[in-house]
Amino acid sequence: MHGSKPPSSARTPSRAISIRIARDPNDLMLVTAIRAAVYLAEQNCPLEEEFDGNDLVAAHFIGFVGSEPAACLRVRFFGEFAKVERLAVRHQFRRSRVSFKLVQASFDYIKRKGFKKIYGHAQDRLVNFWAHFGGKPLGHNRKITFSDFSYTEMVLEIEPGPDAITLDSDPYVIIRPEGDWDRPGVLDISSARPVTSPLRSAALVEP
């Protein structure tokens, strides 16, 4: 009817951007789908080069535009630095700010973990994107090429946040779900139960 509101399914979908850390196999499937669309389909990267064996030893971030998974990014941790890598944005979302918010969320996470340096490999054509966040060429003049692109080593000096997690942090904070340290987790809740396990006083049995 004229003048009636369109059904909800016909309304313009939300373009709000949200970021979350991957927590379960379903989230990792989203990461795989995004990277396959960008790197395998668009850049013709071989499967074994894109999915390099490091995905299960890393933290992954997923960026959403509305309810649609639009982008992802991977973070790995080393002794002195964290490495940001595998930033992928689906082509229809590249005019949004999801990539900027995704990178910033990962940097905030890295600061919370107490790191002082972020390292990455920027495709030469994307050096200016990383410079926007304060990244600078590492300066070692090492030429890096893989998966048919040339890369520049980038480094970003950061200050850990005032709430960075250390050995002095509340032990319950340390065991909360990764990246969600400000909310009580399931183990916080379990701490309200008395110590009743029948094994609580059992001595270890010598082999």
Predicted regions and their residues:
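Terminal substrate-recognition subdomain of acyl/acetyltransferases
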Residues: 2-17, 111-112, 124-207
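Short, positively charged
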Residues: 3-12, 32-44
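A conserved beta-strand-loop-helix scaffold within acyl/acetyltransferase catalytic domains
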Residues: 21, 28-32, 43-93
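A generic structural signal for beta-strand entry/edge sites
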Residues: 79-81, 117, 149-151
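Conserved hydrophobic beta-strand within the GNAT/NAT acetyltransferase core sheet
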Residues: 84, 118-122
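Conserved acetyl-CoA-binding loop-helix of GNAT-fold acetyltransferases
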Residues: 89, 95-108
